[in-house]
C-alpha cells in the first residue's frame, strides 16, 4: 500500500508540480519540493522530515481547479495536504506539514530579522495567512509536539526558491 501512495505522490509532483509555479516565485512546485527535501537531507534530518520536506506543499496540488493562494486568499493547503497524507504517514510527517505555514507566523513574531529575509511573495502570503503571531500565540504554538521540526521545515521552505 505504501508503495502505491509513494508512486501516486511522485506522479502528482512530476505531472502537476512541474507545470505549476510555486506561488509568485521563480520555481515550480516540483522544483521547490525537491529543493526542500535536498536541504533536509543535506542537514542530516530523519527520513520523516525529509519526506515532510518533499510533500509539505502537496495540498497546493490537490485542489480541484485553481489554488486560492493565487487570488491572495489562504486556501489552507497545509491542512489539506496533512489530512490527505495522514492515512499513509504518521504525525512525525504530517504535523510539521500542517504547521509549516504557522511557522512563518511564529518566526515572524519571535525571530528578529526573519520577516526581512522573506521574499515579497512570502510576505504577501504571510498577510493572507493571518500575519505574525502574538507573543501568547507563539508561546502556545512552539510547545506543541513536532513544532521544532516544523520550524526547520519552514526554514527549508524559505530557502528552496532558486
Give each language-model segment a name.
Residues 1-162:
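Metal-dependent phosphohydrolase cores
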